[in-house]
Regions:
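Conserved ABC ATPase signature
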Residues: 90, 131-138
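Conserved catalytic motifs of ABC-family nucleotide-binding domains
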Residues: 152
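Catalytic Walker B motif of ABC-type/P-loop ATPase nucleotide-binding domains
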Residues: 156-160
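ABC ATPase "signature
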Residues: 214-215
Length: 242
C-alpha cells in the first residue's frame, strides 16, 4: 500500500500558482525528500498534505484517507514538525512533551512512559528540565520532532528540518532522522542538496510548483548525465527555466 497518493494537487494565492497540478506517490516506510529552491512549492505541498491549507484543485490520499473529504482521518495518522518549530518557549522540554501527550488523550502514566521513550530515542535527556525558548535551534528541532511523534504517526512530515542549524547540529539531526527510516513514512522538504542525497530513498525536485524529476539520487544523476548530485540538480532546474 502506498502511504501517499497525490493527483492534480493545486494551490493558488491570487494570481500566483504555488503548486501546479502535482502528481506524486510515496511508498510506505519510505524517506522521501521534496527538494527545491525557495518558492518551489515544497512547504505549500506539506501544508496541503497535513490539512493545514485546503487545495484549490486535485486531491491526495494518505493511507487511503482524502485530504479533501476526510481531513480528520488524515490528521489522526500524521505528525508534523513545521519549519518554524512549534514549541512553547516558556515551558520546559518535558512540559512541552506532556502538553502534547495531554492533547492526544494519554493518561499520566502513559505520558511519563512516552516522554521517557522519546527522550531516550532522540537524546533529549540533558535538556528535559530546560525551558524550550532557551534551547539552541538544534535542540528545539529535536524537541519538535519528538512532539510530532507522540501519537505514533504512520506518516511524519519534516519541513526544512535543519534550516538555520550549524554543521554539527545538522549532522546530529541527520542521525535522528536516519533512526526513523523504514519504521514510518517520512516526507521532508529541504533546499540542502547534500541533505536530500544523504537521507532520502527517493527525491522529488520541484520548481515553480511543479515536479521536475523523481527518483533515487543515483537515478537523478544518471538522468542528468552528471557524476555529482549538485550538478544534476542545477542542470535539471536550469533546463526547466529555458
Amino acid at each position: 500500500m502506498n502511504a501517499v497518493e497525490i493527483q492534480g494537487l493545486t494551490k493558488r494565492y491570487g494570481a500566483i500558482t504555488a503548486v501546479d497540478s502535482l502528481d506524486l506517490t510515496v511508498r510506505q516506510g519510505e524517506l522521501f525528500a521534496l527538494l527545491g529552491v525557495n518558492g518551489a512549492g515544497k512547504t505549500t505541498t506539506i501544508k496541503m498534505l497535513s490539512c493545514l491549507t485546503r487545495p484549490d484543485g486535485g486531491d491526495a490520499r494518505l493511507l487511503g484517507r482524502s485530504i479533501v473529504s476526510d481531513a480528520a482521518g488524515v490528521k489522526r495518522c500524521i505528525g508534523v514538525s513545521p519549519q518554524a518549530t512549534a514549541v512553547a518557549p516558556n515551558l520546559t522540554a518535558r512540559e512541552n512533551l506532556a502538553l502534547l501527550c495531554g492533547v492526544h488523550g494519554l493518561s499520566r502514566q502513559e505520558t511519563a512512559a512516552r516522554t521517557e521513550e522519546l527522550s531516550r530515542a532522540l537524546g533529549l535527556e540533558p535538556i528535559l528540565a530546560r525551558r524550550a525558548g532557551k534551547l539552541s535551534g538544534g535542540w528545539q528541532r529535536r524537541l519538535s520532532i519528538a512532539m510530532a511523534l507522540i501519537a505514533r504517526p504512520e506518516i511524519l512530515f519534516l519541513d526544512e528540518p535543519t534550516l538555520g542549524l550549524d554543521v554539527l547540529a545538522r549532522a546530529e539531526l541527520w542521525d535522528v532522522v536516519r533512526q526513523l527510516k523504514g519504521r514510518i513514512t517520512v516526507i521532508l522538504t529541504t533546499h540542502y542538496l547534500e541533505e536530500a542525497e544523504a537521507l532520502s530513498d527517493r527525491v522529488g525536485i520541484m520548481k515553480d510548483g511543479r515536479l521536475l524529476a523523481l527518483g533515487t539520487p543515483e537515478e537523478l544523476k544518471r538522468q542528468a548525465g552528471c557524476d555529482r548530485f549538485e550538478d544534476a540538480f542545477i542542470a535539471m532546474v536550469r533546463e526547466a527555466g529555458r
